[in-house]
């Protein structure tokens, strides 16, 4: 009888200890609970590679990068360079990115993804960049990113690529430099740049909006440098063998 009472008391003490631990955890400040939950989530394996595909048969993905992290919240930086394989000029209305699991189930979707240029000529490329965040508790479920493109029916401008541009990494910044090699002042130059690792995975991307440079005149022989602070996920993977590529466009009305 005494032995049974002792076992019962021990069981009650264990239950009490467990309950006390739960209560103490519940009484933690909310920010500390978030950190604890993030630490547990980050222990789950993050995919080393995620496929990036294009749902539009007119374009194919030439290069991409998906940098996942789950320290305090599930998020992803997604970058892609797509080529227009059709024979038609593509005026881009919007670009969407959808995160899918291995079964093709949608985990998250982002509309109106940043892209450059707004009109993609046949054989030319388009850059796309998006920051996805808080889209799934377990980023290990992400198997692929699907890119969808919606185009306009009319084209009222032409984006002409200019080769007088270069990109490089300086410290924690991705830099892009455009030089006006013509005899006239140039207005409205729009630039973009990527930095990739030795395997071709894009680690970060710089994209300008045409509204940023619409009123900026670059005189003959002058240069302008823009820069973007690299994301933390890019800095962790950046090595001396990084490769940079730059794009520059001038917009002409049709």
Give residue ranges: language-model regions.
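Membrane engagement elements in two modes
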Residues: 7, 18-175, 179-190, 196-254
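Hydrophobic helical h-region of N-terminal Sec-dependent signal peptides
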Residues: 6-14
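Positively charged n-region of N-terminal signal peptides that target proteins for export
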Residues: 1-4
